């Protein structure tokens, strides 16, 4: 299983709210991004423009506030990649490697992978390729099989939670961060899988949304909504977690 490979990579040391309201706020932001014109984009500083193009790629890839359009997502990621290599390059690699919105083309996949900015990354190129391969193999499973989604989100949680800045930078360069993981889980929880309720509880508790930076004490009560939903649907981990909270007089 590819996700087990991710865990092995970590062990080997290669890399050292109301949530309903949060979802609504994200949706409003997605619509604002989608309304940007090329003139708006051209007026932005290069680094900001690359970040916005990456965001446009993400929302079109998953249909967040806009119709899902993998072909359009690819074009945004390509544009982002060309602006310094900090965003989008490995998203393009993924698309060409797996034929996501485009015909498979290993030459194009490698071409865009090489455009990624390697500055300040404490990981050698061979490990970047090997590690990203494991992540993207898990991603394609989650994209094509809904039952794999909770496990993929859990893998991202383990990879991104409480990591050094250098690790966070690496994951961002290949297309993953805490906030995107939270938004994916918020989207996929609509599939009705109780395991996703549990994963969303973990992400909320650890503030992957970034909504509780100034008020971290609010993350715990907000997470209980999702843990309770998971527990009521029979998720043993959620039942155990809530049991510990209630026995301690909390919740």
Predicted regions and their residues:
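Classical Sec-dependent N-terminal signal peptides that target proteins to the secretory pathway
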Residues: 1-24
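Hydrophobic face of amphipathic alpha-helices that form TPR/SEL1-like repeat modules
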Residues: 53-62, 91-98, 137, 158, ...
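Short coil/turn and helix-start
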Residues: 46, 64-68, 82, 98-104, ...
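Helix-start (N-cap) detector for alpha-helical repeat units in TPR-like alpha-solenoids
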Residues: 50-51, 86-88, 194-196, 236-238
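TPR/TPR-like (Sel1-like) alpha-helical repeat modules
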Residues: 104-121
């Amino acid at each position: 299983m590819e996700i087990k490979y991710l865990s092995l990579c970590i062990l080997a040391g290669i890399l050292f709210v109301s949530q309903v309201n949060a979802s609504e706020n994200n949706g409003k932001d997605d619509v604002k991004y989608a309304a940007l014109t090329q003139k708006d984009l051209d007026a932005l500083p290069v680094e900001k423009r690359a970040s916005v193009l990456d965001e446009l790629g993400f929302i079109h890839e998953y249909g967040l506030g806009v119709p899902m359009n993998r072909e359009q997502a690819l074009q945004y990621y390509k544009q982002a990649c060309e602006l310094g290599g900090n965003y989008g390059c490995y998203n393009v690699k993924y698309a060409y490697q797996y034929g996501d919105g485009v015909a498979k083309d290993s030459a194009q996949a490698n071409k865009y992978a090489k455009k990624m900015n390697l500055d300040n990354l404490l990981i050698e190129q061979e490990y970047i390729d090997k590690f990203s391969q494991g992540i993207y193999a898990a991603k394609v499973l989650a994209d094509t099989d809904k039952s794999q989604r909770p496990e993929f989100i859990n893998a991202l949680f383990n990879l991104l939670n409480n990591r050094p800045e250098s690790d966070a930078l690496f994951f961002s360069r290949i297309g993953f961060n805490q906030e995107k993981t939270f938004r994916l889980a918020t989207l996929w929880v609509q599939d009705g899988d109780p395991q996703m309720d549990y994963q969303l509880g973990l992400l909320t508790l650890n503030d992957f949304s970034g909504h509780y930076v100034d008020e971290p004490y609010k993350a715990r009560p907000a997470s209980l909504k999702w843990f309770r939903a998971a527990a009521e649907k029979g998720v043993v981990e959620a039942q155990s977690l809530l049991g510990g909270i209630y026995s301690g007089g909390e919740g």
